[in-house]
Design a protein with these regions (language model features):
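Hydrophobic alpha-helical membrane segments
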Residues: 1-345
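Phosphate-group recognition and catalysis centered on beta-loop-alpha active-site segments
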Residues: 295-594
Length: 594
């Protein structure tokens, strides 16, 4: 029999190898966690020696101004290479030994993976690492490092991209280009790790393989994903049958109906978790198998054992269902005590009134108040003659059709402009001053004043503090900024004035940054970060979740405030959250896990 006739591309043999895959993942992730933990501790100590507690998106100059900076960059690259070794290389090496029927020794695999790093110490290797770290997660390519698997384009950037058709098309074109780069280089790592090719030769080899076999490769991709879908459906069918039986038996028993709902939700959660954790390993085995075929390499290549696989499936099914039944019974018995919660998350209107009124205007503040928002966030900049006006952009081009910047104009000149929000073309306004906004907000809503633009400096802090004190509103305002040095200045000189630091990227002891509030970008707000911030008696704001699902997600966490454009939707979501049905409570909790 020819070697290629031995090859099977069904998902069944992969399921048979699942116990070994799970054991390998457990050990590889544990080893990787330990190594990275050591690097994080050393990196944190290096940051502390600079007199700071963290590096963030608004305070990263130490990377090029101190001797610790280059060391931190080297350690960051070292972390990426470690992830490359123990996150992806181990999977390919493991898959090759599994396919060849060799005895799998974890120590040998980890040793080989660690020393494989040397093959990437060149420009081509660095390019591969950076692609898998930064680009693959964003474009959705199947291979990526778990370190950055949730990497995203920050909302404040993506909103700009999607608001302009040309930006959107350019981004789409880039995504397609990078996807094709990933596709044509899908076998590059296999060439490096299995055939011991240098990076550039492995690239050429992978592209040659795809050009010759692209139809067969795409067909096998389809079969792989089809089989995954079939097992998803099979699992769901079994669960649905059990649910129908339960519903028929306990149709008039609300307590048992809730048990069934819990069981469905937990089963789906486990299915998603297990599939997600094992998917890349299965995918690597499939791709490695194809590499053996296309390169004419011999091996045992996972022969099918359908009887064993059949019993394996039902054993795994029972292994998951029994604990899920017991957990569902426990949660159902203590449902209110464990699962039901109310929220008092405060809603903050972005740019005065969010999408409910022209941005950064008095009408915006009035709209935020009318919808029951806790706060209103505004952006201030200084004029040429020293006054403070409310405007987000670097100039007035978007809203006033004037390309001049606030610092280039006097207050009188700015007051002659007509502000027309594209979302409210029939509702022209005048550019508001800080004082006008303060008067509208006093004793009605908390103002979050962002120190914005080129004029955001210590003078701005001093002037704004003076103004809000004169208005007797020091306890009704929070000064916020993306510039950490300004927030540190507020805390140092005006400790009784509340301050908030906004950041979308941070490393180190972020919670110890000198501020009263920390504002984190949507996807950067994690449960562990929330707990750490609260442990230091600080408050946390998340910006800017506009989709209802994301707002509902954060209502189910311990964040203090949500900054959003969709204020009406968010305040209604708070009310709905506090009046949820049992099934809504269950679905919200399951959603929050992911």
């Amino acid at each position: 029999m020819k070697p290629k006739e031995k090859l099977s591309y069904s998902i069944l043999p992969y399921l048979q190898a699942t116990p070994d895959i799970m054991k390998y993942q457990l050990f590889s992730k544990a080893l990787l966690w330990l190594l990275v933990w050591v690097i994080r501790q050393i990196s944190t100590l290096l940051i502390l020696t600079t007199g700071r507690v963290a590096i963030s998106s608004g305070d990263y100059d130490l990377l090029y101004k101190t001797w610790q900076g280059p060391l931190l960059i080297i350690m960051a690259l070292g972390t990426l290479f470690l992830y490359m070794a123990f996150d992806i290389n181990t999977q390919i090496i493991y898959a090759s030994k599994l396919l060849e029927g060799k005895q799998i020794k974890m120590v040998e695999i980890f040793k080989e993976s660690f020393f494989s790093i040397r093959q990437f110490f060149n420009p081509g290797g660095l390019g591969i690492v950076l692609y898998l770290t930064l680009i693959a997660p964003i474009v959705g390519f199947s291979f990526s490092l778990s370190l950055t698997s949730n990497l995203y384009i920050p909302t404040f950037i993506s909103s700009v991209i999607y608001s302009n058709i040309y930006y959107r098309l350019f981004f789409l074109a880039l995504t397609i280009i990078f996807l094709f780069i990933g596709l044509f280089n899908i076998f590059t790592l296999h060439g490096i790790l299995i055939s011991k090719m240098p990076c550039n030769k492995a690239d050429d080899n992978s592209r040659a393989i795809i050009k010759k076999n692209w139809k067969h490769y795409l067909k096998q991709e389809f079969i792989f994903f089809r089989d995954i879908a079939i097992y998803y459906i099979l699992f769901v069918v079994v669960v649905v049958i059990l649910v129908i039986i339960g519903a028929v038996i306990w149709i008039d028993n609300d307590h048992m109906i809730r048990f069934v709902e819990l069981f469905i939700a937990l089963t789906c959660a486990v299915l998603v978790t297990v599939t997600t954790s094992l998917f890349q390993s299965y995918y690597v085995i499939m791709v490695t198998k194809l590499y053996y075929r296309y390169m004419g390499l011999l091996g045992a290549l996972l022969p099918d054992e359908k009887r064993k696989v059949k019993w394996f499936f039902f054993r795994r099914l029972a292994m998951y269902i029994i604990p899920l039944v017991l957990l569902s019974l426990l949660l159902n018995t203590y449902f209110d005590e464990i699962l039901v919660k109310k929220t008092n998350v405060g809603i903050i209107a972005h740019r005065a009134g969010g999408a409910e009124a022209p941005e950064n205007t008095v009408k915006g503040v009035e709209a935020a108040i009318s919808y029951g928002a806790y706060g209103s966030e505004i952006d201030i900049q200084r004029t040429a003659d020293g006054y403070y006006i409310v405007n987000h952009d670097v100039n007035f081009a978007r809203l006033c059709s004037d390309k001049r910047k606030p610092e280039e104009m006097t207050l009188d000149e700015i007051k002659e402009l007509t502000l027309t929000d594209p979302n409210f073309p029939d509702d022209p306004e005048k550019v508001a001053t800080l004082e006008e906004i303060l008067d509208a907000a006093k004793d009605r809503i908390v103002l979050f004043i962002e120190l914005k633009g080129n004029t955001a400096d210590e003078q701005m802090v001093d002037d704004v503090v003076k103004i809000i004190k004169e208005k007797d509103m020091a306890d009704q305002c929070v000064l916020i900024s993306l510039k950490y040095n300004l927030i540190d200045y507020v805390e140092s000189k005006y400790p009784k004035i509340d301050s908030a630091y906004l950041t979308f990227l941070s490393f180190g002891k972020t919670a110890q940054l000198n501020c009263d509030y920390l504002g984190l970008e949507d996807e950067a707000t994690t449960t562990s970060m929330i707990k750490t911030i609260h442990s230091l008696d600080k408050k946390i704001m998340v910006w800017t979740p506009n989709e209802k699902k994301r707002q509902e997600y954060f209502l189910n966490t311990e964040v203090d405030y949500i900054i959003t454009d969709n204020v009406k939707q968010a305040t209604e979501a708070v009310e709905e959250f506090n009046n949820r049905s049992d099934i809504e409570v269950i679905s919200d909790i399951i959603y929050s896990l992911f």
